[in-house]
Amino acid sequence: MNEYSSTKTFEGYSTAFRQWKAKHSHCQYLHGYAMKFKVTFIGDLDELNWVCDFGSFKRNGIKEHMSHMFDHTTIVAKDDPKLSTFKQLSEEKLIQLRVLDGVGCEKFATYVYNYINNIILKETKARVKVLTVECFEGGTNNSAIYKPIQALNNVDKSISH
């Protein structure tokens, strides 16, 4: 078995959120970024010599779900003390609210990893998996990479051979 990797970028999502626990920082206030995600897939090639058929993302709902979660949305942590206020804004059609375990590049990268990896593993019968997800806040701001420990161990083994 040979392992190849390929990368798909999802970008152009206008997303607002706040780090409510960051009382020492302006990040505690609602603010937004043009979010971008770089998803790296790893696995054997298929009969078309592709690691991953990116065209399938329309059919399997990945493209639509990414847009639903991150395009012109306000994402709030489920433990945000102002969650009820955000829910009211959503009910009044002032925001498109999404609630996640946490917010920020690290949490968004983890969410995207879990969502896409579950679909890809099923669709390819585990021939392909997500290796990493890198989430960018805007064009020049920071990014965070999510890579599960198991994936790190597999990469380390493949490098040492």
Go through each PLM region and give its residues.
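Charge-rich, low-complexity N-terminal segments
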Residues: M1-H161
